[in-house]
Regions:
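Short, extreme N-terminal segment that most often corresponds to the first beta-strand
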Residues: 1-37, 125-128
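Acidic, low-complexity, intrinsically disordered interaction modules
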Residues: 19-21, 25-121
Length: 128
């Protein structure tokens, strides 16, 4: 499976993901680090996955980074920002920070889903 790391990274970087979003996952595969997710991180991952299911998105592992950002923005609008909040909030620093936070969470979690999908669909190349 280690042989698939570089092609995976290359594909994901080509889709606009940053090395930061991929680094943790790749380092876990190579044994260079282990990831112990906090309760908060697990809850965020569940929220992302639940939202993907709610939107009935089957091809999330093939999304480019721009599409992930749009999805994160929709999520913030649908689930985080209370209805009826005035338009001024949408341009505030607080809102931008909130949106950036959720974009990072979506990027990280979807990179993880993409890695699992990539390795599952390409494992035949190394299982010989």
């Amino acid at each position: 499976m280690i042989a698939l790391i570089d092609p995976f990274k290359e594909e994901m970087l080509g889709r606009g993901f940053s090395a930061h979003h991929l680094g943790v996952h790749v380092n876990m595969l190579t044994g260079e680090m282990s990831l112990i997710k906090s309760d908060e991180a697990r809850n965020h991952a569940k929220e992302v996955r639940d939202y993907i299911k709610e939107r009935e998105i089957d091809d999330i592992a093939t999304y480019d980074h721009e599409s992930v950002m749009e999805l994160a923005s929709d999520f913030v609008g649908d689930h985080i920002v209370p209805e009826g909040v005035d338009e001024e909030y949408g341009n505030s620093d607080e809102y931008v920070d909130l949106l950036d936070w959720w974009c990072e969470i979506f990027s990280y979690n979807i990179a993880e889903l993409a890695m699992c999908h990539y390795f599952e669909t390409h494992k035949h190349l190394v299982d010989r």
